[in-house]
Amino acid sequence: MAPPYHGDTREFSMAPAKKIKAKIKKTLPVTGPQAPTVSELMHWYCMNTNTHGCRRIVVSRGRLRKFIWILLTLSAVGLILWQCAELIMSYYTASVSVTVQFQKLPFPAVTICNINPYKYSAMKEHLSELDKETKNALETLYGFSEGKSKVRRDAADWNSTGRNMQSKLLEKIPLLKFDDLFKKTATEILSGHKRKIEGSAFHQGSSMVNIGEPQDVVGFQLCDPNNSSDCAVYIFSSGVNAIQEWYKLHYMNIMAQIPLEMKVNMGYSAEDLLLTCFFDGISCDSRNFTPFHHPLYGNCYTFNSGENGTILTTSTGGSEYGLQVVLYVEEADYNPFLVTSTGAKIIVHDQDEYPFIEDIGTEIETAMATSIGMHFTRSHKLSQPYSDCTETGNDIPVANLYNKSYSLQICLHSCFQRAMVDTCGCAQYAQPLPPGAEYCNYKKYPNWMYCYYKLHEKFVKEQLGCQQICKESCSFKEWTLTTSLAQWPSSVSEDWMLRVLSWDKRQKINKMLNKTDLANLVVFYKDLNERFISENPANNLVILLSNFGGQLGLWMSCSMVCVIEIIEVFFIDSFSIVMRRRWQKMKKWWNDRKAPRPQEPPQVNAPAKEGHDNPVCTDEDLPTFNTALRLPLPQENHMPRTPPPNYSTLQLNAAFTDQLPDTLEGRSH
C-alpha cells in the first residue's frame, strides 16, 4: 500500500466555493461602473474616491465612528451647498468693488455771478408798474410807505382805503388773507371782499415774519381762465414770502419779453464785477473770464472755461496758488423786491459741465474774505446690469437743451421744459429755449402761470415721468468744498485799502467804496491729489469657479478631478446601471411575450440560473469579480487523500509466468 500524500493541504482544507472565489479574485478585479447594483457601486466609490470622508465611512470600525463620519460628511456637504448658494446669489446681485487712486489734476472752471442779476437803475423803466403795485400791497398789508411809520392796517380800514389802491395786476392775481383753511374762505387784502376758495391748497410755509396770529396765512390763487372752478391756491405763513413769490411771477413775465442783447447791457460787465485778480501768483484780468448769461442771475463770468482749448493748471496746493479775486457788487443798485441778500454766488465745475448756479451755487458774503478749499473726486460707475446709469445720455429719450455734456440735472430741466412747451404752449423763462418755442408772457399766453404751477406740482411729486426717464451719468466729477470766513478788510487796514481800490476803480476820493460793496474770494486746492473712484465687477466667472474650488477644497479636500469623478459615478454610471437593468428586464419581458417557450415538466429543486446563464450578465458585459461569483459550482466529488494505484506496475514479466505454477504447487505440498 502506497504511503499517504504529504503535499500542500491548505488548498484541500478550503471549501470549493471559497477556492473559486479566491482564485477569481486574484485574476478579475472589481470595477465600479460594471457593478450590478447601485449599492455595490457606492461601496466601490467610497473605497476609491479622493474625498476622505466617504472612505472613512466604509473603513471605520464600530457604529459610533461610522455615525460620526456620516455626520461630518453630511455637514460638510451642507456647508458646501450653503456657501455655493451664497456665491451664486452674490454673483447675480451684480455687486461692485471700489478702487481709489490719487494723482495730480488741473484747475477747474469757476463761475461767478452777482446775486442781483441786473442793475436796478437800468431796470426801473421796465419794472415801474410792478414796483408800484408791490409798494401798494406792502402799504395795505403792513401800512408800509417810505417816510411813514410801518403800522399794519386792520381789516376794518380795508374797505375805506384799499379799494382805491387796486391795480390791474392785483385784479388778475390778488393777494389773499386766508381766514379758515378748512372752510376754504379768504379775504382780498386790498378790497376786503370775502371769497370762496376753489381748488387744492399748497402750503409754502416759512418761519420768517408772520402776519398777525399764527393761524393767519397769506397767498394767492391761480385759476384756469377757461374754467374758473379749476384753481390752485398757494399759501404762505409769511407775507414777505407771499409778496416775493408774487413779484417773481410778474418779473419773469416782464423779462421774457425783453431781448437778450438789452438784458446783457442792463447787467454787470466783467470790469464792473472784478476789481483784482490773481491766479497761481500771477496777475489776471477780465480777459481771463468767459461771459455767460444766466436767465436768473444775469451776466456771469467763468474763469478757466477752456473755451480756447487751454485749461490752466496750478503748480502746488494752498491758498497762495489758487484763484484770488476781489468782487464789486454795488449794493446800492440792488432790486429791493427781487433779492433780499447782498453778495455774489459762485460754482466750481468741470469745463464740459453746465453751471447750475441756482441749484448748487455757494454764496459769498460782502465785507468778508471767503476761502474755499477744494478736494477733487472723479467717479466712474458700471452701467447695466450693475447700476442704472448712462454713459453718454444718448439712450435717454430727452433732448439736451444745454450745449454741455449730459448730467442728471440737464436731463431733468430739459424734460420739464419740454413738458412745459407741450402742455402750456410756451417755455419757462428760467431754462433754455427749445427749438421753435418762445418764452411765456401774459399777452400771448394768459394761462401760463396756472399751467406752470400745476406742471411744477406734478414734477415735484414725480408724476411727470422725468425722474423715471432720466438717469445718472456713469462718469462724473465732484469738487468737495470747505469754506472759511474772515472779516475783510480789517479795521486798521480798511481806510487805505478802500482808497486804493477806489483809485483802481477810477472813482473820486470823495466817493470812496464801501466795504459792504466788496467781497474777497479765494479758491484753491488743499492738495493736488485726485481721488478716483471706479467700480469693478466684484464677481465674474473666474472668481465664481475659484470660490467653488476653495469651498470644495476647504470642506472636503476635493479638487476639480473629484468633482468630475462625482459627476461620473453619481450621474453617468448610476444612470447607466439603472437604465441597463431596466433595458434587460424590458427586453426579457418582450422576448417572453413575443416567442413563448414550450412547456417543460417542472423540475424539482432546479438550481437557479447563475453566472453567465443569468440574463443580467450577458456576453456583452466584461467579466468582473461579481459576475464570476455567479458561475455554477462544480460537483462535490470526494477526492481520495492518496493517489490511485498505477495498475500497470502490477503486471508481471513473462519470465516469471512459467515459474508461477511451480511455486504454487510447491507451496501446496
From Swiss-Prot:
Its main location: membrane. Belongs to the amiloride-sensitive sodium channel (TC 1.A.6) family. SCNN1G subfamily. Disulfide bonds join C113-C300, C223-C231, C277-C284, C389-C474, C411-C470, C415-C466, C424-C451, C426-C440. Coiled coil: none annotated. The lineage of its organism: Eukaryota, Metazoa, Chordata, Craniata, Vertebrata. Component of the heterotrimeric epithelial sodium channel (ENaC) composed of an alpha/SCNN1A, a beta/SCNN1B and a gamma/SCNN1G subunit. It is found in: Apical cell membrane. It comes from Pelodiscus sinensis. Keywords: Cell membrane, Disulfide bond, Ion channel, Ion transport, Membrane, Sodium, Sodium channel, Sodium transport, Transmembrane, Transmembrane helix, Transport. This is Epithelial sodium channel subunit gamma. GO terms for molecular function: ligand-gated sodium channel activity; WW domain binding.
